[in-house]
């Protein structure tokens, strides 16, 4: 039996934020993540889903090294994560492209600290723009691009540093439904062509099933793994409207909804915020 390589290992991660209570209120501690553990295997897409406030984005930023965890370990290719690094690419919800740079120059941005020549940077950026379907848009500036095109540039920029794992924080949530489905298909195509490992945060149940090999459902704050669901559909997959009619798709979606609905019940005692008495 073939052993799958663990690309990302999250083990016992916890995070608490201190919240300022205001002029007449005490500060308090907010437990966001509690002993959260899971693995992501090489070449797979894993989605994180759960109700708002369960810590999905916080976890992604901890993995990226933008926020310190309070407890637990994170490893990428067996190397501990101690801060930001080139082994992790981050795709934000908003493209946040530099408005004074062309699409190609935005993609080149992450390469400028790697000692590559101008020609090498330009060639790699052009290849990535072609990969995301924008081969002829390299000289256009962000204000000349649609929202969907800007997100393609955002993805190409994250891929430019050739990360071991791609972290995607609701990258399609601000797009209209049609553009969203187009980019979901594009993500699967790009994943197939690059064999990248992806950790994908979304609120959309259908999107989570469609793009993923597995879906991790997080419980309400403090976030922890409630259940990990396998998505058995092989790649390449039919378009999402067609897949929605599959009974297996419907069963997975129903189970995800049940788990999230359970999390919306009154909070567990350990999820209640704690007064800091500072």
Please give the residue ranges for each predicted region.
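The feature captures the beta-strand-to-loop junction immediately N-terminal to the Walker
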Residues: 49-51
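Short coil-to-helix segment of the ABC ATPase nucleotide-binding domain corresponding to the Q-loop/switch region
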Residues: 101-109
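Conserved ABC ATPase "signature" region
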Residues: 108, 112, 119-136, 189
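Conserved signature/switch motifs of ABC ATPase nucleotide-binding domains
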Residues: 140-143, 161
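Hydrophobic anchor residue at the start of the ABC signature
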Residues: 155
């Amino acid at each position: 039996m073939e052993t799958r390589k663990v690309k990302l290992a999250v083990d016992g991660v916890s995070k608490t934020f201190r919240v300022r209570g205001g002029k007449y209120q005490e500060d308090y501690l907010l437990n966001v993540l509690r002993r959260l553990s899971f693995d992501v295997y090489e070449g797979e897409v894993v989605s994180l889903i759960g109700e708002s406030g369960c810590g999905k984005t916080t976890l992604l930023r901890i993995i990226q090294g933008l926020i310190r965890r309070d407890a637990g370990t994170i490893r990428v290719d067996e190397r501990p994560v101690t801060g930001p690094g080139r082994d992790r690419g981050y795709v934000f919800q908003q493209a946040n492209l530099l408005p004074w740079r062309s699409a190609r120059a935005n993609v080149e941005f992450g390469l400028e600290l790697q000692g590559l020549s101008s020609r090498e940077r330009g060639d790699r950026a052009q290849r990535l723009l072609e990969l995301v379907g924008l081969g002829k848009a390299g000289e256009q500036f962000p204000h000349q691009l649609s929202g969907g095109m800007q997100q393609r540039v955002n993805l190409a920029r994250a891929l430019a540093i050739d990360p071991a794992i791609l972290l995607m924080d609701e990258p399609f949530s601000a797009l209209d439904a049609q553009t969203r489905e187009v980019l979901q298909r594009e993500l699967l195509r790009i994943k197939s062509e690059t064999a990248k490992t992806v950790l994908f945060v979304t609120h959309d149940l259908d999107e989570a099933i469609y793009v993923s090999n597995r879906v991790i459902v997080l419980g309400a704050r403090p976030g922890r793994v409630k259940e990990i669901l396998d998505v058995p559909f092989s790649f390449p997959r039919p378009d999402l409207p067609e897949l929605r009619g599959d009974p297996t798709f419907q069963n997975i979606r129903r189970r995800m909804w049940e788990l999230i609905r359970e999390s919306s019940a009154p909070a567990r005692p350990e999820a209640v915020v704690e007064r800091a008495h500072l």
